Structure formats: structure tokens, C-alpha cells
């Protein structure tokens, strides 16, 4: 009631309305979906003293909300970009007190929250979409230590998107990481994971991979390379 700026007042009222709705009720817009994802992430962190709690294949499950709002003229790409940069800044605020040695070696006190984009659909088509580009751009703009950004790479990945990934890597802040679908998916299948689930894997923590809500194994040794071999 005390806010005098009309635009800011409208924003605050919209925030209040959204926060009173999600995640108890389903999200119906991109703004609501982003807020719902944040609330769930925060609740999980608090409830479980969380570690390596990751966002999964963000560009896949958020894409329908994004495109619906874009097509209906409710948001622009720039609006979505701003919302995502705000989400990543909030993600960075989740923290734990670490030892001095860990803090020095880990560029602060990261919680190893990971966001996965790219990859393939369950019918083996390239999964890169418009939101994949927006997520990549938002991470490039913020250049934060959290969340980690992982791009699932495969032979038929959108060339323009992969070129953009390389440009972001050249900025020098260590992201995005690349996960090779053509190695990881067969590995999951060899472990007995169903093919449709293997194609839906995402990165968690530093370098681990899992199928969201279905299968996970902290095979941290996957980051080691056998150079002689």
C-alpha cells in the first residue's frame, strides 16, 4: 500500500498473488512455474539439509509454460531472461558453512545445484529448444558459481546452440559442462535402466548423473580419465 511507483506496485501485487498460489496449486504461467520451482527447491534444501539438489532438465519441463506465455503475449524473451537471472541469484543464496580448505578450493561454499539443458527426447530427437538458449544466456550474464550448468551433447545437437555454448565457455567462468549422451545413455541402459528413462537423465551435483525421480547412483569416479587407455 505504501509503494508509490505504479509499475513496481503492480509487480509486488503480482508476486503476492503468485506466492499465495504455488506450489499448492498448479502453475499456469511461466512466472508461476519459476516461482513454484524455487519454492520446491528451497523447501527441499531446508527439510533435508540438502546437498547437490538439482533442477533436472529445466528447459524441458519449463518449455510448455514459456511457449504458452510467449504465444499469448504475456511475456517476452527478455522477461524470461530476467526471471531466470533472478532465480539463479536466489539459488546462489543457499549456502552452508564450510571449512576454510573447502571454501578456498571450491570458489566459495557451493551447494552443487545443477541445471541441465539440451540432450535428446525419448524418441531420440534433438531436445534443444528456445528456452535452452535463454537458460544459457541467463547463466552467461550472471557468471555465478551456482547453479552449475550442464549441457547434454550428442552428434545431432543444434549446431547454433552448440556454438553458443562454446562462446559461453570462452568467457572463462567454467560453464557449461558437457555430458556426452552417446556415452552416458548406453551406460544407463547397461545398468538396467529403461531406455526411455535413460534418455531423460540429468546432471546432479558436480559430475554425477541420474534419472530424475527414478534412478540415481553417485558414481563420482566418472570424472576420472584413463589417459593411457
PLM regions with names:
Residues 5:
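Acidic, metal/cofactor-coordinating or nucleic-acid-engaging core segments within structured domains
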Amino acid at each position: 500500500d505504501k509503494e508509490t511507483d505504479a509499475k513496481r506496485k503492480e509487480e509486488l501485487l503480482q508476486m503476492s498473488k503468485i506466492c499465495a498460489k504455488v506450489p499448492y496449486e498448479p502453475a499456469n504461467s511461466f512466472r508461476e512455474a519459476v516461482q513454484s520451482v524455487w519454492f520446491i527447491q528451497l523447501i527441499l534444501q531446508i527439510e533435508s539439509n540438502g546437498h547437490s539438489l538439482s533442477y533436472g532438465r529445466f528447459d524441458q519441463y519449463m518449455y510448455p509454460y514459456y511457449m504458452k506465455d510467449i504465444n499469448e503475449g504475456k511475456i517476452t524473451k527478455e522477461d524470461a531472461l530476467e526471471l531466470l537471472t533472478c532465480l539463479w541469484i536466489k539459488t546462489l543464496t543457499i549456502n552452508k558453512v564450510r571449512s576454510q580448505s573447502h571454501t578456498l578450493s571450491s570458489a566459495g561454499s557451493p551447494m552443487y545445484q545443477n541445471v541441465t539443458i539440451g540432450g535428446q527426447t525419448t524418441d531420440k530427437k534433438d531436445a534443444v529448444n528456445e528456452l535452452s538458449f535463454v537458460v544459457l544466456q541467463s547463466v552467461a550474464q550472471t557468471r555465478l558459481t551456482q547453479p552449475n550448468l550442464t549441457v547434454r551433447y550428442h552428434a545431432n545437437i543444434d549446431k547454433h546452440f552448440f556454438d553458443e555454448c562454446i562462446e559461453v565457455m570462452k568467457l572463462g567462468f567454467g560453464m557449461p559442462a558437457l555430458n556426452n549422451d552417446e556415452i552416458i545413455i548406453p551406460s544407463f541402459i547397461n545398468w538396467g535402466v529403461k531406455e526411455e528413462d535413460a534418455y531423460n537423465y540429468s546432471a546432479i551435483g558436480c559430475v554425477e548423473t541420474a534419472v530424475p525421480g527414478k534412478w540415481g547412483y553417485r558414481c563420482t569416479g566418472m570424472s576420472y580419465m584413463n589417459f593411457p587407455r
